[in-house]
UniProtKB/Swiss-Prot annotation:
Gene Ontology CC annotation, any one: cytoplasm
CDD domains the UniProt entry points to: ALDH_F18-19_ProA-GPR
Cellular compartments annotated: Cytoplasm
Gene that this polypeptide is encoded by: proA
HAMAP family given in the database record: ProA
SUPFAM superfamilies assigned to the protein according to its UniProt record, in alphabetical order: ALDH-like
Protein name stated in the entry: Gamma-glutamyl phosphate reductase
Transmembrane segments: none
Keywords: Amino-acid biosynthesis, Cytoplasm, NADP, Oxidoreductase, Proline biosynthesis
Organism lineage: Bacteria, Pseudomonadati, Thermodesulfobacteriota, Desulfovibrionia, Desulfovibrionales
Gene Ontology terms, MF aspect: glutamate-5-semialdehyde dehydrogenase activity; NADP binding
Catalysis performed (reactions): L-glutamate 5-semialdehyde + phosphate + NADP(+) = L-glutamyl 5-phosphate + NADPH + H(+)
UniProt family annotation: Belongs to the gamma-glutamyl phosphate reductase family.
Length: 419
């Protein structure tokens, strides 16, 4: 069977599973999630062995360090997946909830009820834990999902998919509610993008090339998890010791992820004090700086002149743009030009400046005196996320269970007809 036919058959199965999932009870979904948590812990060794095969093959192909980091499933990451299953199991079930209700003059009772999106396709790279996060969120929201992970994580993804299927069967739910494309053929991406007959929405999560390819080819709505070009602006009068800690965490903790810091904007009044401290603390951790002329001498010996192409670049590495600005206006203009609507930070003691930044800066998360690393479904209390949407429709920011649902109108009458 060629890849086109394989994807078509998966679409048919997913559509049938989505119909069954609309009738699934909250208790059945909870049972599946708790069973999956138990299976993940029980099968730690098998998961690690499958992941080791992927890591060895990736190393042979010369996969870069940030992608190797995202590919690796440590004991801590495996336990985190199990805990995510348990957390999502404990979340309120959104399906069937009536959000608004009002009565018309003719006696009609009108309401909006939350329902599943239907069939979702998720296309992603490197991170095998996304297989579990996506599967459990779609399951909790009553959807069916077709997952196409990166070829570098193939064995890990198939192992995790087998555990999800076992959990679904144990709970009496259709195992086709979560399917993983059983092939590394890149033609699967195009085939999924063309399957509008069965797929209601497609979510790409990965590099810029993948996102642009899916947006160009998809015949159904796309929820984009676009690149993360995140900035911190350090305001005049900010707590500089606190700001330095925030900048360090946001850049150094995991430089290859989408909520890592890529640019630092410093008010001119604070540059001579803050930037030497940043150079020492982050420089000692291996960070190099692409700096504007005013920042460069303050970052010695870790800085180089900023190139024209550096602003707006997602480095995925221990590299950061640094610019001295004359005002908050200049900082916000820079962010508007070079940001990616992902995450933006202001470090400030000035409440008025903070609220202005929150109100005017266009990003899926704006943080005041906190790290960009908090733009994450688990960190924000969603349990897990299927991605961080940088689109405003249908969701903006981390997409948890509720973001994978929509609403329909429900009208209750007693014989009314339109006059």
């Amino acid at each position: 069977m060629d890849i086109q036919e394989t994807i078509n058959q998966m679409g048919k199965k997913a559509a049938a599973a989505a119909r069954a999932m609309r009738a699934a009870s909250p208790s059945a979904k909870t049972s599946a999630l708790l069973s999956l948590a138990q299976l993940i812990r029980q099968e730690n060794k098998a998961i690690t062995e499958a992941n080791a095969r992927d890591l060895a093959a990736a190393a042979d192909r010369g996969l870069d360090a940030p992608r190797m980091d995202r590919l690796r499933l440590t004991d801590a990451v495996i336990e985190e997946m199990a805990r995510a299953c348990e957390f999502v199991a404990g979340l309120p079930d959104p399906i069937g909830a009536t959000e608004k209700q009002w009565q018309r003059p003719n006696g009609l009772l009108v309401g909006k009820m939350r329902i599943p999106l239907g069939v979702i396709s998720m296309i992603y790279e490197s991170r095998p834990n996304v297989t579990v996060d996506s599967g459990i969120l779609c399951l909790k929201a009553g959807n069916a999902v077709i997952l196409r992970g990166g070829s570098e994580a193939f064995h890990s993804n198939m192992m995790l998919a087998s555990l999800i299927h076992r959990a679904l069967i144990l709970a009496g739910l259709p195992q086709d509610a979560v399917q993983v494309v059983p092939s590394t053929d890149r033609g699967a991406i195009k085939a999924l993008c063309e399957l509008e007959e069965y797929i209601d929405v497609i979510i790409p999560r990965g590099g810029e090339t993948l996102i642009r390819t899916v947006v160009a080819d998809a015949r159904m709505p796309v929820l984009k998890h676009y690149k993360g070009v995140c900035h911190a602006y350090v305001d005049e009068g900010a707590d500089l010791e606190q700001a330095c800690e925030i900048i360090f965490n946001a850049k150094v903790q995991r430089p290859g992820v989408c909520n890592a810091l890529e640019g630092l904007l410093v008010h001119r009044s604070e540059a001579h004090t803050l930037l030497p401290a940043v150079a020492q603390k982050l420089g000692d951790a291996g960070v190099s700086f692409r700096a504007c002329p005013r920042a460069l001498p303050l970052l010695a010996p870790h800085g180089v002149p900023m190139a024209e192409t550096d602003p707006g670049t997602e480095f995925h590495d221990l590299v950061m743009v640094v610019k001295v600005v004359d005002s908050q206006d200049e900082a916000q203009d820079y962010i508007a030009q070079h940001g990616s609507n992902h995450t933006e930070i202001i470090c400030t003691r000035n409440h008025q400046n903070a609220m202005r930044f929150v109100r005017e800066v266009d990003a899926s998360m704006v943080a005041v005196n906190a790290s960009s690393r908090f733009n994450d479904g688990g960190q924000l209390g969603l349990g897990a996320e299927i991605g961080i949407s940088t689109s405003k429709l249908h969701s903006y920011g981390p997409m948890g269970v509720e973001e994978l649902t929509t609403t329909k109108f429900v009208v209750l009458g007693n014989g009314q007809i339109r006059q």
